[in-house]
Amino acid sequence: THECSSAASDVYKRQIDEVGIILFLLSLFTIFTTSMIYAQLKTVPSWNNMLTPALFIFTALAGGSILLLDYASLVLLLIFGVLQVLFWYIADQSFIHKETSVGTALGFSKNEDIRAFDVAHTNRNYLLNEMVYKVARKHAIKIRYISFFAAFVLPMALILMFPGNFSISVLVIGIHFVGIYFSRWLFFAEAKHSVSFYYN
């Protein structure tokens, strides 16, 4: 009887492990497909690259691994931090290297010197509210520093100082998600849609 119950317990544990792996893979697939909603938008050059899905996936992996409070979470946080910095760099360069200008937005060539005499609308509209959001450069830089410090630097420092200390994990997760909040806000606020050229 004991052997039967032990065998049944082993089978149950294997099934739980298998279900866990399947759910993990489905979660990653969901995150990837969500990220591709943004990555496939050619009208938003800062999103239109393969760093976008990589950033989404490692955001999830790094955040989830914090509960482990071990070196695996440090590695994932480090990869996430590098991807985030690269994403910001590419976002800053995105319109410089794109064949997009006021001319192409209006159907002319990039080299045409096109200037609007007046704004397209007298009042704000949906496109201006959703696609043309301006963030002052000095504020964006400050928010990036806050995001980077809270999402990567502090969590990594606390994990190194208190490895395996589960009570610290709540604090680490809280700090990390503050950084993620600012990072995600910038992801949308700094995105420059091609339609912005039409509105100068």
Residue positions per predicted region:
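Short alpha-helical interface elements
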Residues: T1, M50-I57, V195-N200
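Single conserved hydrophobic/aromatic residue that forms the stacking wall/gate
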Residues: T1-Y12
